[in-house]
Protein backbone atom coordinates (compact mmCIF):
# COMPACT_ATOMS: atom_id res chain seq x y z
CA UNK A 1 0.00 0.00 0.00
CA UNK A 2 1.38 3.38 -0.97
CA UNK A 3 1.92 6.15 1.56
CA UNK A 4 -0.95 8.14 0.06
CA UNK A 5 -3.28 5.17 0.38
CA UNK A 6 -2.33 4.72 4.02
CA UNK A 7 -3.09 8.37 4.78
CA UNK A 8 -6.45 8.06 3.01
CA UNK A 9 -7.37 4.98 5.02
CA UNK A 10 -6.36 6.71 8.25
CA UNK A 11 -8.48 9.76 7.38
CA UNK A 12 -11.49 7.54 6.69
CA UNK A 13 -11.09 5.83 10.06
CA UNK A 14 -10.92 9.18 11.86
CA UNK A 15 -14.04 10.40 10.03
CA UNK A 16 -15.99 7.25 10.92
CA UNK A 17 -14.95 7.54 14.57
CA UNK A 18 -16.04 11.17 14.68
CA UNK A 19 -19.41 10.28 13.16
CA UNK A 20 -20.03 7.59 15.80
CA UNK A 21 -18.93 9.78 18.69
CA UNK A 22 -21.86 11.47 20.49
CA UNK A 23 -22.08 15.18 19.87
CA UNK A 24 -21.58 17.10 23.09
CA UNK A 25 -24.27 19.67 23.80
CA UNK A 26 -23.76 22.84 25.80
CA UNK A 27 -25.03 22.50 29.35
CA UNK A 28 -27.82 24.94 30.14
CA UNK A 29 -27.28 26.53 33.51
CA UNK A 30 -30.16 27.93 35.52
CA UNK A 31 -29.47 31.52 36.49
CA UNK A 32 -30.79 32.86 39.83
CA UNK A 33 -33.36 35.64 39.46
CA UNK A 34 -31.01 38.06 41.21
CA UNK A 35 -28.56 37.66 38.32
CA UNK A 36 -30.99 37.73 35.40
CA UNK A 37 -30.56 41.49 34.97
CA UNK A 38 -27.07 40.80 33.61
CA UNK A 39 -28.62 38.87 30.70
CA UNK A 40 -31.06 41.56 29.59
CA UNK A 41 -30.36 42.35 25.95
CA UNK A 42 -32.70 42.80 22.97
CA UNK A 43 -34.35 39.50 22.07
CA UNK A 44 -33.13 37.70 25.20
CA UNK A 45 -34.90 34.56 26.41
CA UNK A 46 -34.93 34.47 30.20
CA UNK A 47 -36.02 31.69 32.52
CA UNK A 48 -37.40 32.85 35.85
CA UNK A 49 -37.13 30.08 38.45
CA UNK A 50 -39.17 30.24 41.64
CA UNK A 51 -37.74 27.59 43.99
CA UNK A 52 -39.54 29.13 46.98
CA UNK A 53 -42.93 28.25 45.45
CA UNK A 54 -44.63 24.87 45.29
CA UNK A 55 -43.99 22.83 42.14
CA UNK A 56 -46.27 23.30 39.16
CA UNK A 57 -49.10 20.96 38.12
CA UNK A 58 -46.62 18.81 36.20
CA UNK A 59 -44.46 18.37 39.29
CA UNK A 60 -41.67 20.55 37.91
CA UNK A 61 -39.88 23.48 39.50
CA UNK A 62 -42.06 26.58 39.32
CA UNK A 63 -40.72 28.65 36.44
CA UNK A 64 -41.76 31.04 33.71
CA UNK A 65 -40.07 31.44 30.35
CA UNK A 66 -39.92 35.03 29.15
CA UNK A 67 -38.92 36.56 25.82
CA UNK A 68 -37.89 40.17 25.30
CA UNK A 69 -38.66 41.92 22.02
CA UNK A 70 -35.90 42.18 19.41
CA UNK A 71 -35.90 45.97 19.76
CA UNK A 72 -35.95 45.99 23.56
CA UNK A 73 -34.79 49.27 25.10
CA UNK A 74 -34.60 49.75 28.87
CA UNK A 75 -35.64 53.36 28.42
CA UNK A 76 -39.00 52.41 26.87
CA UNK A 77 -42.07 50.69 28.33
CA UNK A 78 -43.66 47.55 26.92
CA UNK A 79 -46.82 45.52 27.43
CA UNK A 80 -46.35 42.17 29.14
CA UNK A 81 -48.28 39.34 27.48
CA UNK A 82 -48.99 36.42 29.81
CA UNK A 83 -50.15 33.12 28.31
CA UNK A 84 -51.98 30.53 30.42
CA UNK A 85 -52.18 27.18 28.66
CA UNK A 86 -54.96 24.61 28.63
CA UNK A 87 -54.98 21.31 30.49
CA UNK A 88 -52.09 21.05 32.92
CA UNK A 89 -50.75 24.36 31.65
CA UNK A 90 -47.11 25.12 30.99
CA UNK A 91 -44.62 27.95 31.06
CA UNK A 92 -44.00 28.66 27.38
CA UNK A 93 -45.06 32.04 25.96
CA UNK A 94 -47.44 32.20 23.00
CA UNK A 95 -47.56 35.16 20.64
CA UNK A 96 -49.63 33.56 17.88
CA UNK A 97 -52.47 36.05 18.43
CA UNK A 98 -50.32 39.19 18.64
CA UNK A 99 -49.95 41.83 15.95
CA UNK A 100 -46.58 43.06 14.75
CA UNK A 101 -44.92 45.11 17.45
CA UNK A 102 -42.80 44.93 20.56
CA UNK A 103 -44.11 42.78 23.40
CA UNK A 104 -42.59 41.05 26.41
CA UNK A 105 -44.09 37.55 26.39
CA UNK A 106 -44.12 34.98 29.17
CA UNK A 107 -45.77 31.67 29.99
CA UNK A 108 -46.85 31.06 33.58
CA UNK A 109 -47.77 27.68 35.11
CA UNK A 110 -50.43 26.65 37.62
CA UNK A 111 -49.50 25.38 41.09
CA UNK A 112 -49.78 21.75 42.03
CA UNK A 113 -53.00 21.01 43.88
CA UNK A 114 -55.02 24.06 42.82
CA UNK A 115 -57.76 21.75 41.55
CA UNK A 116 -61.48 21.96 41.04
CA UNK A 117 -62.76 19.87 43.98
CA UNK A 118 -65.00 17.60 41.89
CA UNK A 119 -62.64 17.31 38.91
CA UNK A 120 -58.93 17.02 39.66
CA UNK A 121 -57.85 17.58 36.04
CA UNK A 122 -59.33 21.09 36.10
CA UNK A 123 -57.78 24.15 37.70
CA UNK A 124 -60.24 25.38 40.30
CA UNK A 125 -58.64 27.02 43.34
CA UNK A 126 -58.25 30.41 41.72
CA UNK A 127 -57.20 32.24 44.88
CA UNK A 128 -54.25 29.88 45.10
CA UNK A 129 -53.47 30.30 41.40
CA UNK A 130 -53.56 34.09 41.71
CA UNK A 131 -51.29 34.14 44.78
CA UNK A 132 -48.84 31.90 42.90
CA UNK A 133 -48.83 33.86 39.67
CA UNK A 134 -48.94 37.28 41.35
CA UNK A 135 -45.69 36.44 43.12
CA UNK A 136 -44.18 35.56 39.75
CA UNK A 137 -45.39 38.81 38.18
CA UNK A 138 -43.97 40.86 41.04
CA UNK A 139 -40.61 39.12 40.78
CA UNK A 140 -40.49 39.59 37.01
CA UNK A 141 -41.15 43.31 37.51
CA UNK A 142 -38.14 43.55 39.84
CA UNK A 143 -35.89 42.42 36.98
CA UNK A 144 -37.83 44.14 34.18
CA UNK A 145 -39.40 47.27 35.70
CA UNK A 146 -40.41 48.92 32.41
CA UNK A 147 -43.66 46.96 32.00
CA UNK A 148 -46.71 49.01 31.04
CA UNK A 149 -49.51 47.41 33.05
CA UNK A 150 -52.25 49.44 31.37
CA UNK A 151 -51.38 47.81 28.01
CA UNK A 152 -50.47 44.40 29.41
CA UNK A 153 -52.44 41.37 28.25
CA UNK A 154 -53.38 38.12 29.96
CA UNK A 155 -54.71 35.43 27.63
CA UNK A 156 -55.61 31.80 28.14
CA UNK A 157 -57.05 28.75 26.44
CA UNK A 158 -59.49 26.36 28.13
CA UNK A 159 -58.18 25.95 31.70
CA UNK A 160 -56.23 29.15 31.13
CA UNK A 161 -59.37 31.12 30.31
CA UNK A 162 -61.16 29.51 33.27
CA UNK A 163 -58.29 30.71 35.46
CA UNK A 164 -58.52 34.29 34.18
CA UNK A 165 -62.26 34.33 34.88
CA UNK A 166 -61.71 32.89 38.35
CA UNK A 167 -58.78 35.14 39.26
CA UNK A 168 -60.75 38.24 38.26
CA UNK A 169 -63.26 37.31 40.97
CA UNK A 170 -60.77 36.73 43.80
CA UNK A 171 -61.54 39.18 46.59
CA UNK A 172 -59.00 40.84 48.86
CA UNK A 173 -55.44 41.87 48.13
CA UNK A 174 -54.05 43.21 44.85
CA UNK A 175 -56.38 42.40 41.96
CA UNK A 176 -55.74 40.99 38.51
CA UNK A 177 -57.06 44.26 37.07
CA UNK A 178 -54.14 46.11 38.68
CA UNK A 179 -51.71 44.12 36.52
CA UNK A 180 -53.53 43.95 33.18
CA UNK A 181 -55.65 46.14 30.95
CA UNK A 182 -56.62 43.52 28.35
CA UNK A 183 -58.14 40.05 28.92
CA UNK A 184 -58.48 37.33 26.29
CA UNK A 185 -60.60 34.22 26.91
CA UNK A 186 -60.31 31.38 24.39
CA UNK A 187 -62.72 28.47 24.87
CA UNK A 188 -62.92 28.97 28.60
CA UNK A 189 -64.47 30.98 31.41
CA UNK A 190 -68.12 31.48 32.22
CA UNK A 191 -68.49 28.11 33.93
CA UNK A 192 -70.39 27.52 37.15
CA UNK A 193 -67.16 27.19 39.13
CA UNK A 194 -64.90 29.71 37.34
CA UNK A 195 -67.55 32.43 37.60
CA UNK A 196 -68.15 32.12 41.34
CA UNK A 197 -68.11 35.50 43.04
CA UNK A 198 -68.48 39.01 41.68
CA UNK A 199 -66.47 40.49 38.86
CA UNK A 200 -64.62 43.69 39.82
CA UNK A 201 -65.13 47.09 38.24
CA UNK A 202 -63.86 46.72 34.67
CA UNK A 203 -64.32 50.27 33.46
CA UNK A 204 -61.50 51.14 31.06
CA UNK A 205 -60.59 47.47 30.53
CA UNK A 206 -60.90 45.55 27.26
CA UNK A 207 -61.77 41.90 26.74
CA UNK A 208 -62.12 39.41 23.91
CA UNK A 209 -63.96 36.12 24.42
CA UNK A 210 -64.20 33.45 21.73
CA UNK A 211 -65.69 29.97 21.59
CA UNK A 212 -66.18 27.19 19.07
CA UNK A 213 -69.47 26.48 17.35
CA UNK A 214 -69.12 22.70 17.24
CA UNK A 215 -69.61 19.80 19.62
CA UNK A 216 -67.06 19.68 22.41
CA UNK A 217 -66.62 23.44 22.57
CA UNK A 218 -67.15 25.57 25.66
CA UNK A 219 -69.83 27.62 23.90
CA UNK A 220 -72.53 27.00 26.57
CA UNK A 221 -70.31 28.77 29.11
CA UNK A 222 -67.93 31.18 27.38
CA UNK A 223 -70.72 32.71 25.28
CA UNK A 224 -72.17 34.18 28.48
CA UNK A 225 -68.96 36.02 29.37
CA UNK A 226 -69.29 39.08 27.08
CA UNK A 227 -72.52 40.25 28.72
CA UNK A 228 -71.11 39.70 32.22
CA UNK A 229 -67.94 41.63 31.41
CA UNK A 230 -69.84 44.47 29.74
CA UNK A 231 -72.09 44.78 32.78
CA UNK A 232 -68.99 45.68 34.80
CA UNK A 233 -67.87 48.35 32.35
CA UNK A 234 -65.47 46.51 30.04
CA UNK A 235 -65.34 47.04 26.29
CA UNK A 236 -65.89 43.50 24.98
CA UNK A 237 -65.82 41.50 21.77
CA UNK A 238 -67.59 38.13 21.68
CA UNK A 239 -66.73 35.87 18.76
CA UNK A 240 -67.86 32.41 17.68
CA UNK A 241 -65.31 30.30 15.82
CA UNK A 242 -67.39 28.68 13.09
CA UNK A 243 -66.54 25.05 12.40
CA UNK A 244 -64.31 24.80 15.47
CA UNK A 245 -64.76 22.56 18.50
CA UNK A 246 -62.47 22.88 21.51
CA UNK A 247 -59.63 24.70 19.79
CA UNK A 248 -58.06 28.02 18.85
CA UNK A 249 -58.22 28.51 15.09
CA UNK A 250 -55.59 30.38 13.11
CA UNK A 251 -58.31 32.60 11.66
CA UNK A 252 -59.38 33.60 15.19
CA UNK A 253 -55.78 34.30 16.15
CA UNK A 254 -55.62 36.73 13.22
CA UNK A 255 -58.89 38.38 14.26
CA UNK A 256 -57.57 38.91 17.77
CA UNK A 257 -54.31 40.34 16.42
CA UNK A 258 -56.25 42.82 14.31
CA UNK A 259 -58.47 43.75 17.27
CA UNK A 260 -55.43 44.31 19.46
CA UNK A 261 -53.73 46.49 16.87
CA UNK A 262 -56.72 48.58 15.78
CA UNK A 263 -58.79 48.72 18.96
CA UNK A 264 -57.38 47.47 22.26
CA UNK A 265 -53.82 48.77 22.04
CA UNK A 266 -54.81 51.79 19.96
CA UNK A 267 -56.95 53.01 22.87
CA UNK A 268 -54.14 52.73 25.39
Task: Please annotate each region the language model reported.
Residues 19-78, 159, 227, 237, ...:
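A domain-start/cap signature at the N-terminus of enzymes
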Residues 77-79, 102-103, 151, 181, ...:
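Alpha/beta-hydrolase fold active-site loops
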Residues 161-174:
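Short glycine-enriched nucleophile-adjacent loop
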Residues 177-261:
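The feature captures the conserved acid-bearing segment of alpha/beta-hydrolase catalytic domains
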Amino acid sequence: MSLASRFLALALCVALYAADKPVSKPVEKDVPRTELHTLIVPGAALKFNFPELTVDRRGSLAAGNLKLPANYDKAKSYPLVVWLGGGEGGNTPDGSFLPAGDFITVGLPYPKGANKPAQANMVGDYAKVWTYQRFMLDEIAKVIPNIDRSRSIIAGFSNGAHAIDGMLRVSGGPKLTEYFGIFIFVEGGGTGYSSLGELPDLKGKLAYACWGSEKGSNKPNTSFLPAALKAKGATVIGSEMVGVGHGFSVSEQRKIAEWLEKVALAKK
